[in-house]
Amino acid sequence: MATRGHVQDPNDRRLRPIYDYLDNGNNKMAIQQADKLLKKHKDLHCAKVLKAIGLQRTGKQEEAFTLAQEVAALEPTDDNSLQALTILYREMHRPELVTKLYEAAVKKVPNSEEYHSHLFMAYARVGEYKKMQQAGMALYKIVPKNPYYFWSVMSLIMQSISARDENLSKTMFLPLAERMVEKMVKEDKIEAEAEVELYYMILERLGKYQEALDVIRGKLGEKLTSEIQSRENKCMAMYKKLSKWPECNALSRRLLLKNSDDWQFYLTYFDSVFRLIEEAWTPPAEGEHSLEGEVHCSAEDAVKFIEDRITEASQSSRHVRGPHLAKLELIRRLRSQGCNDEYKLGDPEELMFQYFKKFGDKPCCFTDLKVFVDLLPAAQCTQFINQLLGVVPLSTPTEDKLALPADIRGLQQHLCVVQLTRLLGLYHSMDKSQKLDVVKELMLRYQHGLEFGRSCLKTELQFSDYYCLLAVHVLIDVWREAGEETAVWQALTLLEEGLTHSPSNAQFKLLLVRIYCVLGAFEPVVDLYSSLDAKHIQHDTIGYLLTRYAASLGQYAAASQSCNFALRFFHSNQKDTSEYIIQAYKYGAFEKIPEFIAFRNRLNNSLHFAQVRTERMLLDLLLEANISISLAESIKSMNLRPEEDDVPWEDLRDNRDLDVFFSWDPKDRNVSEEHKKLSLEEETMWLRIRSLTLRLISGLPSLTHPVEPKNSEKMSENGVSSRIDILRLLLQQLEVAVETGKRFIEKEIQYPFLGPVPTRMGRFFSSGCCQCQVQSFHLVSDMYELDTSGLEGTVDIQERIENSLASLLELLKGVFSTCKGDLLEVTDGNVKTQPAVLENLVFFVETISVILWVSSYCESVLRPYKLNIQKKKKKKKETSIIMPPIFTSFQDYVTGLQTVISNAVDHIKGLEAHLIALRLEELTLEETSISTEERKFSKTVQGKVQSSYLHSLLETGELLRKRLETTKKLKI
């Protein structure tokens, strides 16, 4: 190897400048340098591959691929060429070619550990588990190292996970993997913790829980040291699987004696105690209670154990919360069994009060007590809050001054009480004026609290931020219940003000995004969402807050950008996850590999991914098709085929985080599982409608063909008639989806404001756009029938088409009428928004586009017939040949279309003029006593909404003007 390395040194030196150019992004210079080198050294394959990388990065993919394949055909075995080709194939998203590369290299250099290892990893990237198993064993035979052997074992497990037949998995793959590991155990060759983890994983998947437990408790279990309590946690999991409740109880008791603050073991302890009571288990008369020691099998034992932990905690210098919370948890469980009074554990209200006295100054106090407030009787809630307020250190209130805390500890305590007040529903039961008084008080406390955070960094949150958030939540209540927009404008004002003091507060930003979107203002949202700096999976979990409104508010450029941003994450997921899997193999983190695979599948099947993909393609068609390029070219560039459905309907995963907003609402007002279920149902229905619409549009260009009337046999031969069959089937499915959607919308489901976002489906139906689009697709079907049958003897079809054209025009006028009205209205100094007008306008523009694509197809059918008749007239010089009325009807329809679009363009100009004429000075909040600071933010908020509306109208108007131009080209 040394000699070979020495021979390659001059080549490395020659290649170095090309590598440098590529690393610096100077691809053109890299290509030039490679060309120079290849003139002198024609056989320097690596230079050719590096040139191909340069070509790939400058957009010359085909040329790059040809060069790469020339080198690959030579089956190189030098490191430089192999690594360069690997990089190139990765950039081309062709990882399967890397496997062929190393398969050839391994044949030529069969004893190379490095090449065998690269081959294994190449298989891992493409998920070739069987070949991975073989490659792992081949590697182990060359270099008998344990990791290689266990790579092969893990590949068997992956075959079992990916096998569709569960029986095959449990009778072939897993037993074989088990035998392979047992062989190593018998030969005493198990060396690493990862190998024990793998053995445990196999036994667990086979359902051999007792054997898995024996492994963990035995000598091999001693190797499990990398994680704290790893061995105990695995034992606990197996005890639960085997329903060994005495062992579960004894182990959790023992672990709690070691650390009385470990909450997970309290839950296991209680679970096991009540299971043992249920089973009437009694300890044996002699010997140990269980493998893990003493067992508690009665409520008395549990009560004494918890009381002992509290006594022990009170004598410790370290404050622990676990025992106190465990007492409340035990009360809850005893109550559910109907036997609390016997054990006299105390009054939950008093226990929570004592807990507050100990931990009220900690931010965790609220989240700790939140779980147990249902133990309080409704009648005692106000008394409980007053009791808590009684121990909060506040200044003495005066007529013009609130009772305020003197330090951060006092502020945290008071904040905890305020949060509990909202959670117990005391704010919700107030009338409007009381709620507005609460908002005023909370904002005064917020302003006062800012004094404690003057030294905070910009990346830190202010101590009093929750006061501001709570005030906004109360204002949202006023807005939603009374329908008064003054409250929502004030909420936006407070959030914008809060953001200046806490620029990193994600909750402020999320609420601003949500409210601006509901008001129909997308412009400020893009920067707000961007400043959240969402990382990785968050693009899927919270991305819906942005992409739901991206296409619906008329800001097409920003919508495209938002969709691209989301899609970039999903597309990189496949590549990134492969790298994680490879790292897991390298470092022996075998238990993580199935998790990575499941994670990748979860993202590939993401509901959000399918939605964004569909909306992005519809958006591209809307902006480009028949404007900059033809509809056919647009569809071809997207690789769309009407017969292909790329949505994994059966495996769709809802990865949205519907609890992303902090909420202090009582349980009955919060987001429930039922809300989440209904939201998923609604989202899936809407996705189906959008997906079918896209597929129907994608089928239009394929219907255009040279017409040979009444020659249906020929049509069937060239496959065109099957195209119309596909479209008719899709139209049928669309009508079913629409009916299902309408039934759902009739339920009038109201989601909590801080919960799921409703889809656009309701607006799609109410605006009349749905009916318009469906009818236009029916027109396609009729027009195709006319096309294949000819003009003669098709009077019925022609009449049907004429009626459809007239009806479609009337429907479109109806849709346009829903776009009337101003986006912003000012009456008596109050501002009222009408975002529905904007959403209807955007749907109207989309519907116009769909109708124009359909009309373009109609034109392509009718024009040849008209020309044919005109030719006959000229040829025979006969005036008796009558032109069928369908041509006049179509021309009238096109004229009508132009009028409707022209009116819409004028209407948008009118909306723009009205918006520009609005003077912001007139737009003041109802509350005249607001501070100068608040007034400033109020102007900012209203300015942002006004500017956003204007931007939306400009983009929508511009697109409509382009569509008007395409209408003028519709001539037969």
From Swiss-Prot:
InterPro entries: NAA25_NatB_aux_su, TPR-like_helical_dom_sf. It holds the Pfam family NatB_MDM20. It is found in: Cytoplasm. Keywords: Cytoplasm, Repeat, TPR repeat. TPR repeats lie at residues 11-44, 45-78, 79-112, 114-146. Its main location: cytoplasm. Signal peptide: none annotated. It comes from the Eukaryota. The keyword Disulfide bond does not apply. GO terms for cellular component: cytoplasm; cytosol; Golgi apparatus; NatB complex. Non-catalytic subunit of the NatB complex which catalyzes acetylation of the N-terminal methionine residues of peptides beginning with Met-Asp, Met-Glu, Met-Asn and Met-Gln. May play a role in normal cell-cycle progression. Belongs to the MDM20/NAA25 family. Component of the N-terminal acetyltransferase B (NatB) complex which is composed of NAA20 and NAA25. This is N-alpha-acetyltransferase 25, NatB auxiliary subunit. The lineage of its organism: Eukaryota, Metazoa, Chordata, Craniata, Vertebrata.
